[in-house]
């Protein structure tokens, strides 16, 4: 089928880590997941092939990065690259949990800044925008010049905990670095706040 020039098209693609989440997002937006042929060769290499034309389309590539993180990163990068080479108009890489986010700076000499490398890889692959949720540190947004949307799920958690637990409750940060987030969460919950001091 040949589409009219100028007709807008949005396509949502999912990696293999959490297709259920991507499917729910697609249904909320009144669409279905775009078809992708994903296989793995005997040597572990990933093969990707888009099953429909994406020319001129606004494409979103969703992948949750937990479990086999290195595999899921590579799979999402290949999806982004395939879309770029197939003339997608705009590509948004959606990473609900940003991989390597805790490695956002050098703590010791001769260490990589892995979170920066991940961002660079997605931009190099062809992503026009990155979307993530509740980053470990907000500075990750500054690693790239392209738009980087940092969303928060805090209102959802606040509502859930307010319904689930009776007052008073205390929000504990596992370290000093998380105190700001814990304080914001506690303020929205009208709760106490504390943190664990690591030696």
Predicted ranges, named:
Residues 1-199:
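PRPP-associated nucleotide enzymes
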């Amino acid at each position: 089928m040949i589409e009219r020039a100028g007709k807008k098209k949005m396509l949502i693609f999912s990696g293999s880590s959490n297709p259920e989440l991507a499917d729910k997002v697609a249904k909320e937006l009144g669409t279905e997941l775009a078809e992708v042929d994903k296989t793995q060769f005997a040597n572990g290499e990933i093969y990707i092939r888009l099953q429909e034309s994406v020319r001129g389309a606004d494409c979103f590539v969703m992948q949750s990065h937990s479990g086999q993180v290195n595999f899921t990163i590579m799979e999402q990068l290949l999806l982004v690259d395939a879309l770029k080479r197939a003339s997608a108009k705009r590509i948004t890489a959606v990473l609900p949990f940003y991989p390597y986010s805790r490695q956002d700076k050098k703590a010791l000499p001769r260490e990589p800044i892995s979170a920066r490398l991940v961002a660079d890889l997605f931009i190099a692959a062809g992503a026009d925008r990155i979307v993530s949720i509740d980053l470990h540190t907000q500075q990750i947004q500054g690693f790239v010049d392209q738009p980087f949307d940092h969303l928060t799920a805090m209102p959802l958690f606040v509502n859930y905990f307010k319904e689930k637990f009776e007052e008073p409750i205390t929000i504990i940060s596992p370290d000093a670095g998380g105190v700001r987030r814990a304080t914001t969460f506690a303020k929205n919950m009208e709760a106490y706040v504390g943190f664990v001091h690591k030696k």
